């Protein structure tokens, strides 16, 4: 009777031991190595899983950062602090990534670009596009039905009373969801500090563009002529700014006859001032000034800036090695 119990138990025990050894061997043979830095990087990421980095989520981004196929500042949500934390884990330098925010490159409000028809349907820009490109008179303009607002996971977008989306730069993480969702391609990411922006996406010729919107770019080229830094070109009948070259001197804003380039000339513009006690009269500022607004003699400080001629481009500020120049806003709100 006792043998009838012990024999099956012994057999089961032997089989259990054999299977256990087999599983242990299989675990070693088929083990998938995970770099110990992956969970550390994952913990440093914000965990939004928004896909703004171009990957399915934060887990995938962490693995790609450690694997070397993604930059340490690839997360648009975490910003500089997240990049610094990841850089510390990876033993690298974070660098200085420029924060970007979503911007609407359209000024076609209900008044400046009226509708050509009434739209009855789902309040979604993508669905409205099916009906002959939407109800807007300008076929390139914002429809204003709030698809960008609906897809924003951070509540950074609201639809204003004028029918155009308004982006809160404090909430925007530059994840790019709104850019992907906009059927008119008028949502774009620009550097947060960039105020001078062409707010038009109309590719029609000037006369036609003017008929559909009173603030449309007419490709007149006035901005191109005004820019001293070759930062503006006209492509497909619409002005385009190279933000890497733009000095935000507001000359293009002042010259645009259609007011389609954003920027507050009165309050946004700055003027350069010499800090006399720091000036060593090296002449770098005068040499690089594009309008010859700075005069003086080498080794005879201080140099003098003609504030009426200064366009506020800030080149002298960047070139000065002695912190002898500061940029002061012309007006403060």
Swiss-Prot record:
Its main location: membrane. Its cofactor is [4Fe-4S] cluster. [4Fe-4S] cluster 4 binds at residues 217, 220, 223, 227. Pfam families: Fer4, Fer4_7, FeS. Residues 33-92 form the 4Fe-4S domain. Residues 126-162, 163-192, 207-237, 239-266, 270-299, 301-330 form the 4Fe-4S ferredoxin-type domain. The complex is composed of six subunits: RnfA, RnfB, RnfC, RnfD, RnfE and RnfG. This is Na(+)-translocating ferredoxin:NAD(+) oxidoreductase complex subunit B. It comes from Acetobacterium woodii (strain ATCC 29683 / DSM 1030 / JCM 2381 / KCTC 1655 / WB1). The gene is rnfB.
